[in-house]
């Protein structure tokens, strides 16, 4: 017997049960899609692209470059993970890169002036902190209501928290001469993304 609360009709391809069930549990799906697009733009346009430039300018610090590369590639992995979820929910990406960039939930991590190591590490740290806040918000609104999005967001959040710890360690050492251990090492493989990654993207 069909559930009386059922909205999607037999054979109907204009609606999605995957949306129906989370809407019934209180998820504002249009708002969630908007938030996911903002986070996708932040992961790809605000961080992955600009982290490429920041990494290049960490001149003379190969160890710092490796950590930045891990964060850069993992942000790309996050982008790859978010996009399918946007479409599953019935959303879509803007068909214009500038329009997409302008929706980013975090400020673009543009090369600072002057591009000193301390300024770059500070920018990297604050970018990761913005990501943590953004993903925590999505975890909050999907917990107990949308397990698919919550699982994805919590996996990404785990890695963003690790990234923050990395850049705290590096910045404290470089700027303040202090030891504030992150509690873990760089990845075994660049961009390994142990919590979120679904395929390899390393392209040196």
Where are the predicted features?
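Iron-associated oxidoreductase/ferritin-like identity signal
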Residues: 1-204
